[in-house]
Amino acid sequence: MRKYELTDETIEFDGYITLYRIRALKDFGDVKAGDLGGFIEHEDNLSHENDCWIYNDAKAYLFANIYDSTKVFDNAQVAYSAEIFGNAKIYNNVKIYRGHIFGSVEIYGNVVIDNDSRIYGDTKIYDNSEACKRTMTAQNGDSSAKDDIPF
């Protein structure tokens, strides 16, 4: 059974992509039937299984896939074939482009994850960090822009 539908509310993004606001069709996790979510390009962007959800004005588009119990909030963007699994939580102005996120990862601030980077385990990435060019961050990592961890 489908857990959400696309509404008639749309935005044009990057000048050529139409994104649709989503509306929950049933209760699941902390989402109630009728709640409005963020924006997606196609239903393939957000799984109808489990408790994953896109909140606020967050966006998923261009072959992004969000699964399991992942939660994407605020103005975060997931795009360009990015995949997020597990109990990940993505906040603020994070951009995940072509990245792969697994597990109980938390990413917030103005972080950019790009170019096939893989972030997994109980990792937190925040502030103005960047993970690019096939970066791999393993379990129990903690990184911010004020650290000298090379991303």
What are these regions (language model features)?
Residues R23-K26, D57, N75:
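Short, flexible beta-strand-to-coil junctions
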Residues M1-D51, D122, G141-F151:
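Terminal amphipathic alpha-helical/low-complexity segments used for targeting or macromolecular assembly
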Residues R2, R21-R23, R98, R118, ...:
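Arginine residue identity/basic-tract feature
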Residues D44, C52, A58, A64, ...:
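Residues at the loop-to-beta-strand transition
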